[in-house]
Swiss-Prot record:
Probable substrate-specific adapter of an E3 ubiquitin-protein ligase complex which mediates the ubiquitination and subsequent proteasomal degradation of target proteins. PROSITE patterns: BTB, MATH. This is BTB and MATH domain-containing protein 41. One of its GO terms (cellular component) is nucleus. The gene is bath-41. Residues 232-293 form the BTB domain. It comes from Caenorhabditis elegans. Keywords: Ubl conjugation pathway. Residues 1-33 are annotated as: Disordered.
């Protein structure tokens, strides 16, 4: 009797399902569809230089609000004109050069651009730029630099800023046009090659010795030098007669005013190593100097509410301590009330803090009837009539049409010295 136990012959073919290494049956992937496109922006750039000879004579011949016009520049689609006020555009800016850029011709209703004004000096170009990286204004609009350059600084270093009695101003414009999107070839990701990675790693090999600097100790040392006067080489005197022993390297590094003043070794201040301010208080100088020394060590000393005074704002603008601008903008834009908005909006206007000015203007627009009943409004009208008119005009324009009218009716004043 034969018993069949189901065993297969040795040479019999056995069918085994195909499986992936993970034990699952493989599934064929459907092909992916890849496409690409690129968006490009049309740009145009213009550069124009204007040299004014016998500039010291021009200063004598022109009163505030009197101006000079440069020839037009541009191309067939765009046309611009520079307008210079040697002694300021009005009495309020009489201590500064004022520079306007007029847009005479533009193919589009609105113009988007980035602008840079420069003064060509014996030490190279000094540039001024807009606080906002990108500016949009209407066709036939005006860009103004009301306080383009201090005449006091110019006169203190005439051989630097007007060599051979020639003032040369440069204007660089980059205009951003419409964007176009086109279908392009397949996108190829950027490859980070092994060689680039190994080069990067080699710069920080274990055998490399690094010098680590304790920032807190540097800050403490700088503050101590200011407090003790150790190693000081320059004396600043406040209006009350209090003396501050300081260090020229810190002053020049943190203030454009002192950089220009101390660069000219023939000035009385440099030779005597002493500078007296008849209109800046000791309290204000103490706040400014502490900030300058802290920022030189990479620290920021926050301003207190009681330190925010008009004396501080004027001194900061005069000494061109640009590193303090963000802290001032933060402080004057917070805890705004009907009682303090007028003082703060005046500060924002003086420092040309345009974003902060717009925020404060919105608050004033919503409470203008209350604000205009305050004594502070009467004082502003009496002390700074042009500013009071500007604030009022901007407020009503802002109320009428927040999206466009305020932008259209205001002259943009956004240039600061760098």
């Amino acid at each position: 009797m034969e018993i069949n136990n189901g065993a297969q012959p040795e040479n019999a073919a056995v069918s085994i399902p195909s499986r992936s290494p993970s034990g699952k049956s493989e599934k064929r992937k459907s092909p992916s569809i890849v496409s690409g496109c690129r968006t490009v922006m049309n740009e145009r750039s213009f550069t124009n230089y204007w040299s004014v000879e016998r500039f010291t004579v021009q200063l004598e011949l022109h009163n505030p609000a009197e101006f000079m016009l440069a020839p037009k520049f541009g191309d067939g689609d765009y046309e611009f004109v520079m307008k210079l006020f040697p002694n300021g555009k009005d009495e309020e800016t009489a201590g500064y050069l004022s520079l306007f850029l007029l847009i005479n011709k533009c193919p589009n209703p609105r113009l988007r651009f980035r602008v840079s004004f420069t003064v060509e000096t014996a030490d190279g170009p000094r540039s001024c730029h807009l606080n906002k990286n990108l500016v949009t204004i209407n066709r036939s609009g005006i860009v103004t630099a009301s306080k383009f350059f201090s005449l006091d600084i110019l006169r203190s270093a005439m051989n630097v800023y007007i060599p051979n009695d020639i003032l040369t101003i440069g204007c660089e414009l980059t205009i951003f046009g419409e964007c176009t999107t086109q279908i392009s070839s397949l996108f190829k990701p950027y490859q980070r090659t092994h060689s680039a990675s190994s080069t990067s790693r080699s710069l920080s090999s274990p055998n490399t010795k690094c010098l680590k600097i304790d920032e807190s100790s540097a800050h403490d040392a700088f503050t101590e030098f200011l407090s003790t006067g150790e190693f000081s080489d320059f004396i600043i005197v406040a209006s009350c007669g209090r003396e501050f022993p300081t260090h020229m390297c810190i002053l020049a590094a943190r203030s454009e005013y002192f950089k220009v003043l101390l660069r000219n070794h023939s000035t009385k201040e440099f030779m005597s190593k002493r500078l007296q301010f008849d209109d800046i208080s000791a309290r204000t100088l103490d706040v400014l100097l502490r900030h300058m020394y802290a920022s030189a060590a990479g620290r920021v000393v926050k301003l207190e509410e009681d330190q925010l005074t008009e004396d501080l704002i004027s001194a900061m603008d005069r000494l061109m301590i640009n590193s303090l601008r963000d802290e001032v903008a933060r402080l004057i834009g917070s805890k705004v009330t009907v009682d303090n908005v007028l003082t703060r909006i005046s500060m924002a206007a003086e420092l040309r803090l345009d974003d902060t000015y717009d925020v404060l203007l919105d608050f004033f627009s919503n409470h203008k009837h209350e604000c205009m009943k305050l004594t502070a409004w009467d004082e502003l009208e009496s002390a700074k009539p042009p500013l009071a008119i500007k604030i009022l005009r901007d407020a009503f324009s802002n109320t009428d049409s927040p999206s466009t009218t305020s932008m259209d009716s205001r002259i943009i004043d956004r240039i600061t010295l760098t």
